[in-house]
Amino acid sequence: MAPRPLNEIVEAGWAKALEPVAGQITSMGEFLRAEIAAGRTYLPAGANVLRAFQQPFDDVRVLIVGQDPYPTPGHAVGLSFSVAPEVRPLPGSLVNIFRELNTDLNLPQPANGDLTPWTRQGVLLLNRALTTAPRKPAAHRGKGWEEVTEQAIRALAARGKPMVSILWGRDARNLRPLLGDLPALESAHPSPMSADRGFFGSRPFSRANDLLMRLGGQPVDWRLP
Protein backbone atom coordinates (compact mmCIF):
# COMPACT_ATOMS: atom_id res chain seq x y z
CA MET A 1 0.00 0.00 0.00
CA ALA A 2 1.39 3.40 -0.99
CA PRO A 3 2.04 5.80 1.90
CA ARG A 4 -0.49 8.58 2.34
CA PRO A 5 0.73 12.09 1.47
CA LEU A 6 1.71 14.21 4.45
CA ASN A 7 -1.05 16.72 3.81
CA GLU A 8 -3.60 13.97 4.45
CA ILE A 9 -2.26 13.06 7.89
CA VAL A 10 -0.94 16.33 9.35
CA GLU A 11 -1.98 19.99 9.24
CA ALA A 12 -1.06 21.80 6.01
CA GLY A 13 1.62 23.98 7.58
CA TRP A 14 3.21 20.94 9.16
CA ALA A 15 3.04 19.03 5.88
CA LYS A 16 5.25 21.69 4.32
CA ALA A 17 7.54 21.93 7.35
CA LEU A 18 8.06 18.16 7.49
CA GLU A 19 8.48 17.64 3.74
CA PRO A 20 12.29 17.25 4.11
CA VAL A 21 11.67 14.19 6.32
CA ALA A 22 8.64 12.77 4.49
CA GLY A 23 10.69 9.72 3.51
CA GLN A 24 11.72 9.16 7.12
CA ILE A 25 8.08 9.36 8.25
CA THR A 26 7.25 6.70 5.66
CA SER A 27 10.13 4.57 6.97
CA MET A 28 8.84 4.89 10.52
CA GLY A 29 5.40 3.77 9.35
CA GLU A 30 7.03 0.71 7.82
CA PHE A 31 8.88 0.08 11.09
CA LEU A 32 5.61 0.17 13.05
CA ARG A 33 3.88 -2.15 10.59
CA ALA A 34 6.79 -4.56 10.93
CA GLU A 35 6.40 -4.46 14.71
CA ILE A 36 2.74 -5.44 14.37
CA ALA A 37 3.61 -8.18 11.87
CA ALA A 38 6.12 -9.57 14.38
CA GLY A 39 3.44 -9.77 17.08
CA ARG A 40 4.52 -6.63 18.92
CA THR A 41 2.41 -3.55 19.57
CA TYR A 42 3.26 0.09 20.10
CA LEU A 43 1.96 3.20 21.83
CA PRO A 44 0.12 5.48 21.21
CA ALA A 45 -2.55 4.10 18.88
CA GLY A 46 -1.72 4.56 15.21
CA ALA A 47 -4.17 7.41 14.72
CA ASN A 48 -2.40 9.40 17.46
CA VAL A 49 1.23 8.89 16.47
CA LEU A 50 1.39 12.20 14.55
CA ARG A 51 -1.27 13.95 16.64
CA ALA A 52 1.08 16.74 17.73
CA PHE A 53 1.25 17.86 14.10
CA GLN A 54 -2.49 18.26 13.70
CA GLN A 55 -2.56 21.67 15.37
CA PRO A 56 -1.66 24.66 13.15
CA PHE A 57 2.09 25.03 12.57
CA ASP A 58 1.80 28.81 12.33
CA ASP A 59 0.04 29.08 15.71
CA VAL A 60 2.75 27.44 17.85
CA ARG A 61 4.12 29.86 20.44
CA VAL A 62 5.31 27.51 23.19
CA LEU A 63 7.17 24.24 22.64
CA ILE A 64 7.26 21.67 25.46
CA VAL A 65 9.49 18.70 24.68
CA GLY A 66 9.04 15.27 26.22
CA GLN A 67 11.19 12.15 25.81
CA ASP A 68 8.82 9.50 24.51
CA PRO A 69 5.20 8.41 25.09
CA TYR A 70 4.00 7.01 28.39
CA PRO A 71 4.67 3.24 28.27
CA THR A 72 1.62 2.35 30.38
CA PRO A 73 -1.15 1.03 28.10
CA GLY A 74 -4.02 3.50 27.95
CA HIS A 75 -1.90 6.51 28.88
CA ALA A 76 -0.18 7.73 25.69
CA VAL A 77 -2.33 9.98 23.48
CA GLY A 78 0.21 11.51 21.09
CA LEU A 79 0.81 14.71 23.09
CA SER A 80 3.76 14.80 25.48
CA PHE A 81 2.76 14.54 29.15
CA SER A 82 -1.00 14.50 28.35
CA VAL A 83 -3.38 11.60 29.05
CA ALA A 84 -7.02 10.91 28.21
CA PRO A 85 -9.57 12.52 30.56
CA GLU A 86 -10.57 9.20 32.13
CA VAL A 87 -7.05 8.12 33.17
CA ARG A 88 -6.62 7.64 36.94
CA PRO A 89 -4.29 7.84 38.73
CA LEU A 90 -2.32 10.46 36.82
CA PRO A 91 1.29 9.71 35.82
CA GLY A 92 3.80 11.04 38.32
CA SER A 93 5.30 13.55 35.88
CA LEU A 94 1.89 15.07 35.24
CA VAL A 95 1.12 15.26 38.96
CA ASN A 96 4.31 17.27 39.38
CA ILE A 97 3.52 19.52 36.39
CA PHE A 98 0.16 20.35 37.96
CA ARG A 99 1.82 20.99 41.33
CA GLU A 100 4.20 23.48 39.69
CA LEU A 101 1.32 25.05 37.74
CA ASN A 102 -0.42 25.72 41.05
CA THR A 103 2.72 27.10 42.69
CA ASP A 104 3.59 29.27 39.70
CA LEU A 105 0.19 30.70 38.74
CA ASN A 106 -2.02 29.76 41.70
CA LEU A 107 -4.28 27.76 39.40
CA PRO A 108 -6.52 25.02 40.84
CA GLN A 109 -5.92 21.32 40.34
CA PRO A 110 -7.31 20.39 36.90
CA ALA A 111 -10.18 17.91 36.78
CA ASN A 112 -8.16 15.48 34.66
CA GLY A 113 -4.87 15.05 32.81
CA ASP A 114 -6.00 16.08 29.33
CA LEU A 115 -3.72 18.89 28.13
CA THR A 116 -5.57 19.41 24.84
CA PRO A 117 -6.71 22.92 25.92
CA TRP A 118 -3.05 23.97 25.95
CA THR A 119 -2.67 22.92 22.31
CA ARG A 120 -5.55 25.25 21.41
CA GLN A 121 -3.49 28.02 23.01
CA GLY A 122 -0.58 27.32 20.67
CA VAL A 123 1.38 24.99 22.96
CA LEU A 124 3.07 22.15 21.06
CA LEU A 125 3.43 19.03 23.25
CA LEU A 126 6.10 17.12 21.35
CA ASN A 127 7.95 13.94 22.28
CA ARG A 128 11.41 13.35 20.80
CA ALA A 129 10.40 9.78 19.95
CA LEU A 130 6.77 9.52 18.86
CA THR A 131 6.21 5.85 19.77
CA THR A 132 7.34 3.27 22.29
CA ALA A 133 6.57 -0.33 23.19
CA PRO A 134 4.06 -1.11 25.96
CA ARG A 135 5.72 -1.18 29.39
CA LYS A 136 9.13 -0.46 27.83
CA PRO A 137 10.21 3.18 28.21
CA ALA A 138 12.49 4.46 25.44
CA ALA A 139 12.00 1.27 23.40
CA HIS A 140 11.88 3.24 20.14
CA ARG A 141 14.50 5.81 21.00
CA GLY A 142 17.16 5.90 18.30
CA LYS A 143 14.90 4.12 15.79
CA GLY A 144 14.45 7.21 13.60
CA TRP A 145 11.83 9.48 15.11
CA GLU A 146 14.47 11.96 16.24
CA GLU A 147 15.15 12.96 12.63
CA VAL A 148 11.47 13.87 12.27
CA THR A 149 11.06 15.77 15.52
CA GLU A 150 14.33 17.66 15.10
CA GLN A 151 13.18 18.83 11.67
CA ALA A 152 9.93 19.98 13.29
CA ILE A 153 11.87 22.07 15.79
CA ARG A 154 14.19 23.53 13.15
CA ALA A 155 11.15 24.51 11.06
CA LEU A 156 9.53 26.24 14.03
CA ALA A 157 12.72 28.17 14.78
CA ALA A 158 12.99 29.28 11.14
CA ARG A 159 9.55 30.93 11.09
CA GLY A 160 10.75 34.16 12.68
CA LYS A 161 7.75 34.24 15.03
CA PRO A 162 7.70 34.66 18.82
CA MET A 163 8.17 31.27 20.49
CA VAL A 164 9.45 30.07 23.84
CA SER A 165 10.66 26.52 24.43
CA ILE A 166 10.35 24.68 27.74
CA LEU A 167 13.03 21.99 27.93
CA TRP A 168 12.62 19.56 30.81
CA GLY A 169 15.43 17.07 31.34
CA ARG A 170 18.67 16.30 29.54
CA ASP A 171 17.10 14.84 26.40
CA ALA A 172 15.12 18.02 25.84
CA ARG A 173 18.01 20.33 26.72
CA ASN A 174 20.14 18.65 24.06
CA LEU A 175 17.83 20.24 21.48
CA ARG A 176 18.79 23.77 22.51
CA PRO A 177 21.17 24.33 19.53
CA LEU A 178 18.28 23.76 17.08
CA LEU A 179 16.42 26.77 18.45
CA GLY A 180 18.87 29.44 17.34
CA ASP A 181 18.27 32.74 19.12
CA LEU A 182 14.81 31.82 20.41
CA PRO A 183 14.55 31.76 24.21
CA ALA A 184 14.41 28.47 26.07
CA LEU A 185 13.64 27.66 29.70
CA GLU A 186 15.65 24.69 30.96
CA SER A 187 15.19 22.67 34.14
CA ALA A 188 15.15 19.16 35.53
CA HIS A 189 12.49 16.76 34.26
CA PRO A 190 9.16 16.67 36.18
CA SER A 191 9.54 12.93 36.76
CA PRO A 192 9.31 11.94 40.45
CA MET A 193 12.93 10.80 40.11
CA SER A 194 14.22 14.28 39.26
CA ALA A 195 11.61 16.96 40.01
CA ASP A 196 13.27 17.90 43.32
CA ARG A 197 16.49 18.69 41.45
CA GLY A 198 15.31 21.91 39.85
CA PHE A 199 11.87 21.39 38.34
CA PHE A 200 9.93 22.47 41.41
CA GLY A 201 10.22 26.22 41.76
CA SER A 202 11.30 26.79 38.14
CA ARG A 203 8.05 28.69 37.33
CA PRO A 204 8.07 27.76 33.62
CA PHE A 205 4.53 28.91 32.88
CA SER A 206 4.80 32.50 34.10
CA ARG A 207 8.34 32.83 32.74
CA ALA A 208 7.24 31.58 29.31
CA ASN A 209 4.49 34.20 29.23
CA ASP A 210 6.90 36.95 30.29
CA LEU A 211 9.27 35.99 27.47
CA LEU A 212 6.46 35.78 24.92
CA MET A 213 5.30 39.28 25.76
CA ARG A 214 8.87 40.58 25.56
CA LEU A 215 9.04 39.12 22.05
CA GLY A 216 5.81 40.87 21.10
CA GLY A 217 3.65 37.74 21.36
CA GLN A 218 0.51 36.97 23.33
CA PRO A 219 0.66 35.10 26.65
CA VAL A 220 -0.77 31.60 27.03
CA ASP A 221 -3.84 31.01 29.18
CA TRP A 222 -2.56 28.00 31.12
CA ARG A 223 -5.88 27.29 32.88
CA LEU A 224 -7.25 23.78 32.50
CA PRO A 225 -10.85 22.72 33.21
From Swiss-Prot:
PANTHER family: URACIL-DNA GLYCOSYLASE. Pfam families: UDG (PF03167). It comes from Streptomyces coelicolor (strain ATCC BAA-471 / A3(2) / M145). HAMAP family: UDG. It comes from the Bacteria. The active site is at D68 (proton acceptor). This is Uracil-DNA glycosylase 1. Signal peptide: none annotated. InterPro entries: UDG_fam1, Ura-DNA_Glyclase_AS, Uracil-DNA_glycosylase-like, Uracil-DNA_glycosylase-like_sf. Its main location: cytoplasm. One of its GO terms (biological process) is base-excision repair, AP site formation via deaminated base removal. It is found in: Cytoplasm. Belongs to the uracil-DNA glycosylase (UDG) superfamily. UNG family. It catalyses: Hydrolyzes single-stranded DNA or mismatched double-stranded DNA and polynucleotides, releasing free uracil. Its EC number is 3.2.2.27. Excises uracil residues from the DNA which can arise as a result of misincorporation of dUMP residues by DNA polymerase or due to deamination of cytosine. CDD domains: UDG-F1-like (cd10027). Keywords: Cytoplasm, DNA damage, DNA repair, Hydrolase. The keyword DNA repair applies. GO terms for molecular function: uracil DNA N-glycosylase activity. One of its GO terms (cellular component) is cytoplasm.
